[in-house]
Amino acid sequence: MSFRDFTFPQVCTDLGLNFDEKSLFRDVAPISIDAHTQEFLELGRTMSSGINNEKARSEFVIAPFLLKLYILSGKRFGLFSGTELNVDASRGLNGVCDFLLAREPLVYMLRAPLIAVVEAKNDNVNNGFGQCVASMKAIELFNHKHGKPTETIYGASTTGVAWKFFKLQDTNLTLDSDDYDFSNLDKIAGILMHIVTTK
């Protein structure tokens, strides 16, 4: 069993989480994404839609968007792609995370505290919920194990076009009730910047 085997909402029962749904980022200010980057991402969206698989969406849309955010932040966080996170195999809290965001801007080493996970899905953003939540719980345990416990862990499930966000605080899981899509890139950028810069 691994992250990918978890389903939602069963993951809440499996991991002993209390679930709630409410707006999380309504007051977060958007960050302007320049026209060149938007054009580049639109091209990536078109290409990935034609190829129609998770790898294409991850490489052509999500990774470039996160890399742009990394630059806009002044390289203030660590960004890892396709990294294994093996915390507790007996509970299925192991596997490969599409993208991990870390507090420290390291490139060659995954170090606590991790702050967020972004999971890529091909067609339906909801299909990534179970995997995303399990990865968030693994991050919480990883940070605790390495002496860097964090109060809040964030997660996102995305097709590169649609985005849904989660927040985990101990055993309390909250799904953001607001939906975001490709037309809200500035808002999505603002949310992600809020996540990586808030301590």
Where are these regions (language model features)?
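Charged, often low-complexity linker/regulatory segments
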Residues: 1-67
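Glycine-rich, often proline-containing surface loops adjacent to acidic residues and nearby aromatics
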Residues: 38-44, 111-119
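Conserved catalytic cores of phosphodiester-cleaving nucleases, focusing on short active-site segments
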Residues: 61, 97-105, 113-122, 135
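Short terminal or interdomain "cap/linker" segment that borders an active site or interface and mediates
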Residues: 157-199
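Nucleic-acid nuclease catalytic cores
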Residues: 123-174
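Extended hydrophobic secondary-structure segments that form protein cores and membrane-embedded regions
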Residues: 81, 114-119, 153-159
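Short secondary-structure junctions
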Residues: 69-79
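Active-site metal-binding core of divalent-cation-utilizing nuclease and nuclease-like domains
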Residues: 77-107
